[in-house]
């Protein structure tokens, strides 16, 4: 029995030794898998840097747009803050002009000193008021002889006239005004009808 045991002992122990030796390799395999799946710190830093740069560029663009909007709003506030007051003053200017137009031509030519002084005073007041409005960006439109533009003019009637191009402003019923780049009040006008079409400039001629 002893000999058989000694004889079979080494052979029986061999598989156990192989199994024991294989265990460290099996334990090392998960470590190898973990090392291959771990994120690269350099790549993480690059991705974070790109994300921060994108956020910075977006913020810079938003701040630039905000600055431009603020500058435009401040400019508009300065330019158009007097629009309501100027519109009210135009009614006063219109009344001064109506008063002057109501004076008959023969009365003007009569040479009455009192009437002449009154006319000069009203005209001076009108000029002074228009000059004050112009200092605040309000300008009077004089569209007589110009082509009718619905952005600046309001057609009140048509005048048969074959001597000027069609849709030419031939009479101003009420003066128009602009403030800055905006129309404060369109000019009320009469336009010609029946004349030739307005000549087209070379720049407006469509290309063949």
From Swiss-Prot:
Protein biosynthesis listed as a keyword: no
User: Keywords for this entry?
Assistant: Chaperone, Cytoplasm, Stress response
Region (Disordered) location: 1-42
What is the purpose of this protein? Answer: Participates actively in the response to hyperosmotic and heat shock by preventing the aggregation of stress-denatured proteins, in association with DnaK and GrpE. It is the nucleotide exchange factor for DnaK and may function as a thermosensor. Unfolded proteins bind initially to DnaJ; upon interaction with the DnaJ-bound protein, DnaK hydrolyzes its bound ATP, resulting in the formation of a stable complex. GrpE releases ADP from DnaK; ATP binding to DnaK triggers the release of the substrate protein, thus completing the reaction cycle.
Where primarily located? cytoplasm
Q: Which PROSITE patterns match?
A: GRPE
Cite the record's note on assembly. Answer: Homodimer.
Q: Does the keyword Endoplasmic reticulum apply?
A: no
- Which CDD domains does the entry link to? GrpE (cd00446)
Which family does the similarity line name?
Answer: Belongs to the GrpE family.
Q: Could you tell me which InterPro entries the record lists for this protein?
A: GrpE, GrpE_coiled_coil, GrpE_head
GO BP, sorted A to Z: protein folding
- Membrane-crossing residues? none
Its source organism is Rhizobium meliloti (strain 1021) (Ensifer meliloti)
Q: Please report the name of this protein according to its UniProt entry.
A: Protein GrpE
